[in-house]
């Protein structure tokens, strides 16, 4: 019989694979940016927010804060590398005004993380206290990111069209939320359960909306397809966050 820890590891590995796919969902956007050597109207905000989210989860999962959470560390460590690459590309092809804003936000995030790390390690001396402090921060920022798709879902209902909410991404989002919720329930972790439970719920709602409005969606023109880009959610738009929970939508930038 499989032990709970073994089952948890298997589910966590599956979650890592799914979340990694979600982290890669903005690749077409950045391929377009590289080809045109211009960020056009795209914003770095979602990627900056996802970077902060990943940093918090990496800190949460290290042994001195929350033992036995290495799979949380691995996927969010990968997320840091992926998001850092996106931001480097964005910085490379941005005008000076956007570059300065990016650097300012990055600076604030790094100062915030330094304050969190020092505050937690110096003031909390047990795993329980450290997990609680960092976990609450992870839940707060992670949950905010999951409310972003509400704008897209509202648009689907209003237009009776799922043009901006692809089925495959909605399905993967749902599976990702379910997978990480299961991971958190096997060895109960409230801080991983809450944001990923929300991810599973929002993913399910997206699938229901897709089923309701798929037939009323007009066929897209080639021009519409050319400008449709997946992007990372962290604010209004579309996103992938991981603890590994993720919610992904597609927005159009013109």
UniProtKB/Swiss-Prot annotation:
MtN3/slv domain boundaries: 10-98, 133-216
Compartments, record wording: Cell membrane
Major localization class: membrane
GO biological process, one term: carbohydrate transport
Gene Ontology, cellular component aspect: membrane; plasma membrane
GO molecular function: sugar transmembrane transporter activity
Segments passing through the bilayer: 10-30, 46-66, 70-90, 102-122, 132-152, 166-186, 190-210
Record keywords: Cell membrane, Membrane, Repeat, Sugar transport, Transmembrane, Transmembrane helix, Transport
Topology feature Cytoplasmic, residues: 31-45, 91-101, 153-165, 211-254
Membrane topology: Multi-pass membrane protein
Gene3D superfamilies named in the record: 1.20.1280.290
PANTHER family from the UniProt entry: RAG1-ACTIVATING PROTEIN 1, SUGAR TRANSPORTER SWEET1
Subunit and interaction comment: Forms homooligomers and/or heterooligomers.
Function: Mediates both low-affinity uptake and efflux of sugar across the plasma membrane.
Family statement drawn from the similarity comment of this UniProt entry: Belongs to the SWEET sugar transporter family.
Protein name, as recorded: Bidirectional sugar transporter SWEET6b
Organism: Oryza sativa subsp. japonica (Rice)
Encoding gene, per UniProt annotation: SWEET6B
